Amino acid sequence: MTSKQIALILLCFLAINAESHDHQLQQQSAERGSENIISHSCIHDQIIEERKRPGRQVYSVTPQIYGQSGISKPLHRKGRALLGISESSLQQKDVKQPIRIFLNYDAVGHSPDRDCRKVGDIVKLGEPPVASRPGTPCNPHGDPPLYGDCWYNCTVDDISGKDKKHRLRKALGQTGDWFRRALAVEPVKGNLRLSGYSACGQDGGVQLPRGYVEEGVADADLVLLVTTRPTTGNTLAWAVACERDQWGRAVAGHVNVAPRHLTAEAETLLSATLIHEVMHVLGFDPHAFSHFRDDRKRRRSQVTEQLMDEKLGRMVTRVVLPRVVMHSRNHYGAFSENLTGLELEDGGGRGTSGSHWEKRLLMNEIMTGSVDTRSVVSKMTLALLEDSGWYQANYSMADHLDWGRNQGTDFVTSPCNLWKGAYHCNATQLSGCTYNREAEGYCPIVSYTGDLPQWARYFPQANKGGQSSLADYCTYFVAYSDGSCTDTNSARAPDRMLGEVRGSSSRCMASSLVRTGFVRGSMTQGNGCYQHRCVNNSLEVAVDGIWKVCPEAGGPVQFPGFNGELICPAYQELCSTGSVSVPGQCPSSCNFNGDCIDGRCHCFIGFHGHDCSKRFCPGNCNGQGKCLSNGICQCENGYTGIDCSTGNVIFLGEA
């Protein structure tokens, strides 16, 4: 009996008799942490709510100087590291430069009531009453990870030794370098000054060095204060902004990394986690949305919309920012006016709800509520940061997100039980191909101890659904641990009786093939891994070294020496390297300078033409600037924005 058949038998049994935890809309075992953490659960929103307690300040406002020249004296940098140093003091006004992130490690291991310094230490998480010690112990393996007020019992893994500190600096250094390449910002002129009004951050925060307040920090646009305090569950790190400038941009933040995750095994996951958490500091935070600026540098009137979605059967919150919508349309191939925004997460408890993309729609995107080693940064996430008005995004730093690509408007706006192909599976399809055809997979269906929400009931049994609350309990094929068609190292040996071959050119396809003279078993229709190639505008597949041309729209092909047939995918599914022709698409995708709706470009301010390829000075710079030959306004002193219509001394409290 093959491992696939064993897995199917077990799955059938589990589908009937699965035991699970209470249905409090938390993630199930497939997403849970263990001794080998496979994913990071973010608790960002939960931390923000904790900071809203009476008497606590969420952030301070410290105006910075922009658009003026001047050379600053460097600070003594013991225990610090500077990333992305540039001679920005003489840069042209309003020209954005790679963001300079300054990392301060002074607080690592130096908070006796917060840091684990020896085994058996009892330290605080949150603000537990002193009188309760140790009456409210933390559950280090709690799931979901709980950010609360408790006392943590330190183990050897929680102590930041020399090796862990080295890993910390390496990981954060790489994070800072990634953002330096991904984002540009109007550089602070002179030293970046911080208020020092209160401790920066959460969980006791970090007291700002006096020099940061009196002299400022040279060559920096953002200061991150680093700590290594313990966390619970599979939360590897967390981060919050604590100071903003007069435009609302974060200029200081607190990043905490749990020492027990500073290991060689967690290195790749930690890298993705730190990018995720620093994104929260930079602006992917519902509490930062109210400070977002438009191209005129005026406060945005709307960042999100919340409404009752009748098709989904529940309240949803969508980001309606122009570049987010534009890149969403191009990703999903959804050019209908019915796509009005990109949905934010509504599941997963207070830690993830509202501050992440909806996992149902973006799956392994890095800003969903759980991060793993497959997480990628999409153009939609970079677009959100650019739509803040604070940054210019380098979209070449975005990764290729497969999930949902070219699936159309209905994929974004309809319940997942109406999705097509490998994006949806049910109790009668226990085995199939994953959505990208890179692996054979199974359909995990969980029986919960309580009923699921009305909108998540995709089965006659009200307590049955998919394994992830973050993905709205949708059911889709998940790869077998040994089911990869492309990775020969981790996959099981191909079944020669079925004509399978595994390797970089192989993909999963439905098949009933079996060598003549052999019996396939009880499965008349299954799936397997077969080689493919794209030649002469055709998709070809191979079995036993014999190549056959597939029908353009997909369909069955037979091979000599085999009974049964192989079902080819459509040509565009495996062979389209560029954008797929989708109804309503616009010429040149409006050059990404405008939104495409039903085949017509709606250009962003400062652009015009049928494909938004031409620049112009909006309002002729309102008489407060010079219109350059390239169609860009060069504003006079005292004015800013794409059309020089906004005074450049505006504080957070102003409209």
Predicted regions and their residues:
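Extracellular zinc-dependent metalloprotease catalytic-domain scaffold
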Residues: A18-A272, V281-G584, S588, D595
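Extracellular repeat turn/loop positions enriched in glycine and acidic/polar residues, especially those
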Residues: F604-G606, E636-G638
